[in-house]
Amino acid sequence: MKLVSSTYVTPSLIAKHLNEQLEKHEFSGAMVFVSADIEYEVLLPLLSLECPYIGSTVLTAQHGVDNAFSTCVVVIFGKEHEPVVGEMRDIAKISNGTTFAFSTSDPEIADYCKISAFSGGLAADNWAFERMAVFLNGNIIESGTVGLHIKSGNETTFDCGWETIPGTRARVTKS
């Protein structure tokens, strides 16, 4: 397996570059959600983020520390790999096949996981990341702070995993 990037995805790093792309300066954090069914080579240039968001289908950014997730800006990569920007409150307009995750405090997360084609992702109750969860195939797996670790096998397959960093309680991988 070739190591594509061992750099940790940090909310502040993604927010910094998203602010530049959207010409905004109030975003405090971001999350990466992973889907193994989309080739990362196609996704890399979409937002030109200088961080390893390889394999992402959804990237969210929230302004403010304690704002509800309904105020998030959502960037969704559809079948044509074109990014669409909207707000998470418009989630009802998103296809059931969209890879997505809600905050761990969202009461509808269990119902959503049942209807979504969900691979995996990270979610937290707020951008202070006081309570974080890892999702894998619709299941909630509690964890601490995690980083996204990407390995590439060949042109059509790759391994996406969550590599623990100091203070974590779990390690989850998806291949």
Residue ranges and their predicted role:
Residues M1-S175:
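Cofactor- and metal-binding active-site motifs of prokaryotic enzymes
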